[in-house]
Design a protein with these regions (language model features):
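Hydrophobic faces of well-ordered beta-strands that scaffold small-molecule active sites
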Residues: 3-9, 32-34, 59-63, 84-86, ...
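Conserved N-terminal beta1-alpha1 strand-loop-helix module at the mouth
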Residues: 1-70, 119, 126-129, 235-240, ...
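Active-site/ligand-binding-proximal alpha/beta "capping" segment
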Residues: 132-187, 191-193, 363-398
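Conserved anion-binding
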Residues: 5, 68-153, 158-159
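Alpha-helix-loop-beta-strand connector modules within alpha/beta enzyme cores
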Residues: 43-64, 98-115, 147-170, 204-218, ...
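Short, small-residue-enriched loops and turns at beta-alpha junctions
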Residues: 11-16, 36-42, 65-68, 90-93, ...
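C-terminal helical cap(s) of enzyme catalytic domains, especially alpha/beta-barrels
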Residues: 98, 179-181, 190-218, 397
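Feature captures the catalytic cores and cofactor-binding loops of soluble hydro-lyases/lyases
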Residues: 217-371, 384-438
Length: 438
């Protein structure tokens, strides 16, 4: 069986899905998938419209059926799908019913092993009741925590002889590995649908699949450990991070003394009184290269930081300094090039009395910063990533950036407005009326 490329259209707007499908098919995509978000947003009309646009191509209706298998497979088949999906977590009877309905209505059944405790065992059951194929699936919410499908793919491939599909953050870089592990169909979503040029991205992935040589991708590699955090966090912005954290607030209203620079590093925290610069300066000695010094001095003058402290911090190799308080000597600090972000600027400092603490929990404007949390600062503000979730948040922020890149290309290429591209009017929240019915 020649390895095939399936494009997962995980949009919520049909017009965007159709555009990506057109580009993908031009790039050599073999199978189109109506992704679950698209199916929920647009219904089976998405299958019908794709069938009209692509009458000769296989179409997967990714309904992820858990119940009512006969009805869901019947309607998918009548809408034009050639493959319907049922979750491996569904009951045995539901999977069996889907397979019987598939035989009756002429639609192939793909059992998605997403979340199955023993994927290989469930794959064997699926094959025994007549499923056409099984899907080894590492979902987005696991990918952002460093998961990948390779281990499960090898186990499932060894367990069954029916076709095995694979999904889970696959790009031109990783496609050869999943083919080598036994995938018959490689399912790709974001690496194509978020690419500025989906046609070129699809072609690159196909070449990598069939040549066995990893290719290039504009999608960033997802990270799996804290060791890789700095690389990805200096590529995303604080707005991307806020979006990734469900629009979480960041520290704003700070002056970036060296504009145009983005910094990222683990926090060394200080709390001090306004104007008391003893603990902030002493904290430099506690820092390692790449750390970000975060100082809470109440957000008001007098200054607790200046040029001499900045010289020390630069020599120590700090990534930067965030001052929730006042700074002075700003012209000289700019000359040094040390990234410093401060809430206010004033010429007068206080005395170094030592009324403060180093390595403490900070909470400013409702935002918590613990020692070791990751801090990202740029011209827009300062974001704090809890250390325990920093890898996940960084990956989600990159996902947000890549999605924005695709929207930008659609705006520029098609001459549309943002509201038109994302169908903003349709997605305004509908609320319960407070008016009494007449």
């Amino acid at each position: 069986m020649t390895v095939r490329l399936q494009l997962a259209l995980d949009f919520v707007d049909l017009h965007r899905a159709l555009k990506a499908a057109e580009e993908g098919v031009r790039g050599g995509v073999d199978v189109l998938e109506v992704g679950t978000p698209l199916l929920k947003a647009e219904g089976l009309d998405a299958v019908r419209k794709l069938r009209q646009a692509f009458p000769r191509i296989d179409i997967v209706c990714d309904g992820k059926t858990m119940d009512a298998g006969r009805l869901e497979l019947e309607t998918a088949a009548k809408a034009g799908a050639t493959v319907g999906t049922v979750l491996g977590l569904a009951s045995d009877s539901t999977i069996e019913e889907c397979c019987e309905a598939g035989r009756n209505y002429g639609i192939k059944v793909l059992v998605d092993l997403l979340g199955c405790p023993d994927p290989a065992a469930r794959a064997r059951f699926a094959a025994s009741v007549g499923a056409w194929a099984v899907n080894v699936h590492c979902p987005i919410d696991e990918q952002v925590r460093g998961g990948d499908p390779l281990e499960a793919l090898r186990a499932v491939r060894a367990a069954v002889s029916i076709p095995v599909t694979v999904a889970g953050g696959i790009t031109a870089r990783s496609a050869p590995a999943v083919v080598a592990a036994g995938a018959d169909i490689v399912i790709v979503g974001g690496a194509i649908t978020k690419a500025r040029d989906a046609e070129t991205a699809a072609r690159s992935i196909l070449e990598a699949m069939r040549s066995g040589v990893a290719g290039d991708s504009e999608m960033a590699e997802r990270i799996s450990s804290e060791d890789e955090l700095r690389r990805i966090l200096t590529e995303v912005s604080t707005p991307n991070i806020s979006d990734a954290m469900h629009r979480a607030p960041c520290w704003s209203g700070l002056h970036a003394l060296v504009p145009g620079i983005r910094i990222a590093g683990p926090a060394v925290t200080v709390r001090t009184a306004p104007g008391d610069w003893a603990k902030p300066v002493e904290a430099i000695d506690h820092c390692k290269p790449g750390d970000v010094l975060v100082i809470d001095s109440g957000g008001v003058p007098p200054a607790i930081w200046g040029e001499l402290a900045s010289n020390s911090a630069r020599n120590r190799g700090l990534a930067g300094v965030v001052i929730l308080g006042a700074v002075r000597d700003t012209a000289n600090i700019r000359t040094l090039g040390l990234p410093v972000y401060a809430r206010t600027i004033c010429p007068n400092a206080g005395e170094p009395k030592g009324f403060g603490e180093i390595g403490v929990s900070l909470r400013v404007d409702g935002i918590s910063c613990q020692p070791g949390d990751w801090v990202v600062a740029d011209d827009d503000g300062v974001a704090v990533l809890p250390r325990a979730r920093s890898v996940e948040i960084a990956n989600r922020a990159m996902y947000c950036l890549e999605a924005e890149n695709r929207v930008r290309s659609e705006i520029n290429d098609g001459g549309q407005t943002l509201a038109e591209v994302v169908d903003l009017y349709k997605w305004e929240k509908q609320v319960i009326s407070q008016e009494d019915p007449e």
